[in-house]
UniProtKB/Swiss-Prot annotation:
Site (Required for activity): S362
Any one of the GO CC terms: proton-transporting ATP synthase complex
Species of origin: Myxococcus xanthus
Subcellular locations according to the entry: Cell inner membrane
Binding-site positions, ATP: G169, D170, R171, Q172, T173, G174, K175, T176
Descriptive protein name: ATP synthase subunit alpha
Keyword field: ATP synthesis, ATP-binding, Cell inner membrane, Cell membrane, CF(1), Hydrogen ion transport, Ion transport, Membrane, Nucleotide-binding, Translocase, Transport
């Protein structure tokens, strides 16, 4: 075998030409201590606040504390396998999550990783968890209604696109039910929804996902789940991951709704994180910046100006109170940040008034700007009348001799309470709400004072349900005209009055029921 020098030199030249110097340089540190989801790391001198770092076992962490000789890192995953002395490296990336329509119909964790077993998510865009909220110039006042499908809310505590409306109440009063009904009602309205479950049982989240699937709402909804068994950092960052996903729709000329269920648990997770990071505690052991935690989150919900694309992100944060105490630290913080609150009361819930909305304490600071004209026409004085009824009902318990006007007000109020009762998972289109409320509050004829005046109180719920069925069958144009014109014109009033009169002639009250 002949060895040719020129052949060998040619091969060596090719090897030298194709040689690539593949050396990766990473700034590394060492774990000093680890426990309860927090690691202290020595050596990451160039680390940024909010930067992701990677531990030796592949688990990621988020830099929260920058101190003279170490950094405090929140571990975003299982910290049991991390040991003192392990190597940690910087990723030089600020924490971000995948966003886009690819996440619709999926259940993900706060890092955007799928939890539903449907395979990887093919999102092409990512967004940072923490970004600055839109400024004053970028915003527009809230003026479009976001229909919840719940009569008591759309009539008395209206929510607009871009608003922050707090849902507050004790446990087991129907807070999540109000939020889920609102999500279900967005079907066909081009509103994308994000449901953020913070510190909840996995079985509870599974039930919510199952209900959303059953009513066809998962096709436009993303569920961000941080379960009760997840580390505190995951529970703390879940709302920020959800709002980053919602901002994608807001900034791309679309409308989105985000539900935080619930921010009380996020505050508890943040308190745990802060105490483990040795930050000084304040009132109720919460750190001093817990107000800022919620304000910077909720300020990202906005209605953008026409120049910015006119998109919107509406937030429905949920807060759980203890024994109805709305003056506690976290409830008062969030009440002061939001544009109104829906207060759910235990006593009303157990009295069978569901949704258990306390109309006196609930308020929307956007008001009738977030209502269609037809709803303004029929529900204008409803809140005042209900408040008067509650006051009179309290006094009526002590006296039996009531004058006729008082008896009339009490009877009318009792019917109005019945009118506002609504089953779970039964959101109602706004035009049908208007038809029902018109029947109860019509003021065109002062002698009538409502078409259901002579209907027994116990039959009001059945009357409302059967009236809509009757109107759909015999007078379908009334609902169609209301939906298209969005106001009660003289023609619609005439047609609606005719439909109610015809129905009252055929309605059969329950035998023996009191009027």
């Amino acid at each position: 075998m002949e060895i040719r020098a020129d052949e060998i030199s040619r091969i060596i030249r090719e090897q030298i030409k194709d040689y690539g110097k593949k050396v990766t340089v990473a700034e590394t540190g060492t774990v000093l201590s680890v426990g309860d989801g927090i690691a202290r790391i020595y050596g990451l001198e160039g680390a940024l606040a909010g930067e992701l770092v990677e531990f030796a076992n592949g688990v990621q962490g988020l830099v929260l504390n920058l101190e003279e000789d170490n950094v405090g890192v929140a571990i975003m995953g299982d910290f049991q396998a991390i040991r003192e002395g392990d190597t940690v490296k910087r990723t030089q990336q600020i924490a971000s999550v995948p966003v886009g329509k690819e996440l619709l119909g999926r259940v993900v964790d706060p890092l955007g990783k799928p939890l539903d077993g449907k395979g990887p998510i093919a999102a092409t865009e990512t967004r940072r968890l923490e970004v600055k909220a839109p400024g004053i110039v970028s915003r527009k006042s809230v003026h479009e209604p976001l229909q919840t499908g719940i009569k008591a809310l759309d009539a008395l505590v209206p929510v607009g696109r871009g608003q922050r409306e707090l849902i507050i109440g004790d446990r087991q009063t129907g807070k999540t039910a109000v939020a889920i009904d609102t999500i279900i009602n967005q079907k066909g309205l081009n509103v994308y929804c994000i449901y953020v479950a913070i510190g909840q049982k996995q079985s509870t989240v599974a039930q919510v996902v199952e209900k959303l699937n059953r009513y066809g709402a998962m096709e436009y909804t993303t569920v961000v789940a941080s379960n009760a068994s997840d580390p505190a950092p995951m529970q703390f960052f879940a709302p920020y991951a959800g709002v980053a996903m919602g901002e994608y729709f807001r900034d791309n000329k679309m409308h989105a709704l985000i539900v935080y269920d619930d921010l009380s648990k996020q505050a508890v997770a943040y308190r745990q994180l802060s105490l483990l990071l040795r930050r000084p505690p304040g009132r109720e052991a919460y750190p001093g910046d817990v107000f800022y935690v919620h304000s910077r989150l909720l300020e990202r919900a906005a209605k953008l100006s026409d120049e910015e694309g006119a998109g919107s992100l509406t937030a429905l944060p949920i807060i759980e109170t203890q024994a109805g105490d709305v003056s506690a630290y976290i409830p008062t913080n969030v009440i002061s940040i939001t544009d109104g609150q829906i207060f759910l009361e235990t006593d009303l819930f157990f009295a069978g008034v569901r949704p258990a909305i306390n109309v006196g304490l609930s308020v929307s600071r956007v008001g009738s700007a977030a209502q269609i004209k037809a709803m303004k026409q029929v529900a204008g004085t409803m809140k005042l009348e209900l408040a008067q009824y509650r006051e009179l009902a309290a006094f009526a318990q002590f006296g039996s001799d009531l004058d006729k006007a008082t008896q009339e007000t009490l009877a009318r109020g009792a019917r109005m309470v019945e009118l506002l009762k609504q089953g779970q998972y039964e959101p109602m289109p706004v035009e049908k709400q208007v038809m029902q409320i018109y029947a109860a509050t019509n003021r065109d004829d002062p002698k009538k004072r409502g078409w259901i005046r002579d209907i027994p109180t116990a039959d009001v719920v059945r009357w409302m349900r059967e009236f809509l069925e009757f109107a759909d069958g015999k007078h379908p144009n009334v609902a169609k005209d209301l939906a298209s014109k969005r106001e009660l014109t003289a023609d619609i009033k005439t047609a609606l009055s005719k439909a109610i009169t015809e129905f009252n002639e055929v309605f059969q009250p329950t035998p023996g029921a009191k009027v």
